[in-house]
Curated annotation (Swiss-Prot):
Gene source species: Mus musculus (Mouse)
Phylogenetic classification of the source organism: Eukaryota, Metazoa, Chordata, Craniata, Vertebrata
Keyword Translocase: no
Cellular localisation: Cytoplasm; Endoplasmic reticulum
Assembly and interaction partners: Homodimer; disulfide-linked, upon oxidation. 5 homodimers assemble to form a ring-like decamer.
Name of the protein in question: Peroxiredoxin-4
Length: 274
C-alpha cells in the first residue's frame, strides 16, 4: 500500500512537471524564433549596407585628403535621364558669355555638336585647368562644327568673379567658352552627376550630336581632369561614322583605317592589320 502511494505521488509529480513544461514551451519557442528573426534582420541590414555602397571615391570631396565612401543614395547616377543614343536631357539657364549674363539653352546648339561638361566648383584646383584648356582650344572645336559649354552649381555672379580673377591667382581670366549656372542643381541631377552629400557634381562630360542625341558620356572622380585631345578625337570619330557609316576601331584618329560593319567588309580591315 505504501509503495502504491509513493508510485501515485511520483506519477502526480511527473504530471505536474509535464504540465509546467507544456506551459513553458510556447514562450521558449517564441523567444527562439524572435532571436533567429533578429539575427536575420541584422544580416539583411549588413547586406543592404554593402549593396548600397558605391565604389570608393579616391578624392572624396573637392579637397584632397577628404576621401569617404559614398553610398548610392548620395549621388544621382542611378536617376540620370542621360541615356546614350537618346535625346540629351533639355536644359536652359543663365550663363556668362564674354563677360555678360545671357540666357542659354540646349536647343541653341541644334545643328552642331556640343561638348557639355560639368565641373565641381569655381575657385578650386583642377577645374580652372580644364576650363582654360578647353577655352584655349575652342577654335579646334569650332572648325569641326562643335561648341563647348561648361557648367557648375555656382551662380552666374560667382562665375563672373572667377573670370575676373587673374589666372596667376587661380582665376580664369578672359575665357572663350560659356559658363552655365545650375544653381538649383536640376541640370546636374538630370545628367546624373550631382553628389547630394557634397552639394556639387562629379566631372561629367557629354558629347551631344547635331540632332540633339547623346553620343558619349565620361565621368571622372574628382581629383583627375579630362583630356581635350581625347574629347576632340571622340567628336571626330562620331562625325566620321555619321558621314561614312563605317565604324572606328580602338585609338582611331582622322586618316586612320576604319571598319565596314558587315561580316565580309570587316575582313578588309583585319587583313591589312595582320
Amino acid at each position: 500500500m505504501e509503495a502504491r502511494s509513493k508510485l501515485l505521488d511520483g506519477t502526480t509529480a511527473s504530471r505536474r512537471w509535464t504540465r509546467k513544461l507544456v506551459l513553458l514551451l510556447p514562450p521558449l519557442l517564441l523567444f527562439l524564433l524572435r532571436t533567429e528573426s533578429l539575427q536575420g534582420l541584422e544580416s539583411d541590414e549588413r547586406f543592404r549596407t554593402r549593396e548600397n555602397e558605391c565604389h570608393f571615391y579616391a578624392g572624396g570631396q573637392v579637397y584632397p585628403g577628404e576621401a569617404s565612401r559614398v553610398s548610392v543614395a548620395d549621388h544621382s547616377l542611378h536617376l540620370s535621364k542621360a541615356k546614350i543614343s537618346k535625346p540629351a536631357p533639355y536644359w536652359e539657364g543663365t550663363a556668362v558669355i564674354n563677360g555678360e549674363f545671357k540666357e542659354l539653352k540646349l536647343t541653341d546648339y541644334r545643328g552642331k555638336y556640343l561638348v557639355f561638361f560639368f565641373y565641381p566648383l569655381d575657385f578650386t584646383f583642377v577645374c580652372p585647368t580644364e576650363i582654360i584648356a578647353f577655352g584655349d582650344r575652342i577654335e579646334e572645336f569650332k572648325s569641326i562644327n562643335t561648341e563647348v559649354v561648361a557648367c557648375s552649381v555656382d551662380s552666374q555672379f560667382t562665375h563672373l568673379a572667377w573670370i575676373n580673377t587673374p589666372r596667376r591667382q587661380g582665376g580664369l581670366g578672359p575665357i572663350r567658352i560659356p559658363l552655365l549656372s545650375d544653381l538649383n542643381h536640376q541640370i546636374s541631377k538630370d545628367y546624373g552627376v550631382y553628389l547630394e552629400d557634397s552639394g556639387h557634381t562629379l566631372r561629367g562630360l557629354f558629347i551631344i550630336d547635331d540632332k540633339g542625341v547623346l553620343r558619349q558620356i565620361t565621368l571622372n572622380d574628382l581629383p583627375v581632369g579630362r583630356s581635350v585631345d581625347e574629347t576632340l578625337r571622340l567628336v571626330q570619330a562620331f562625325q566620321y561614322t555619321d558621314k561614312h557609316g563605317e565604324v572606328c576601331p580602338a585609338g582611331w584618329k582622322p586618316g586612320s583605317e576604319t571598319i565596314i560593319p558587315d561580316p565580309a567588309g570587316k575582313l578588309k580591315y583585319f587583313d591589312k592589320l595582320n
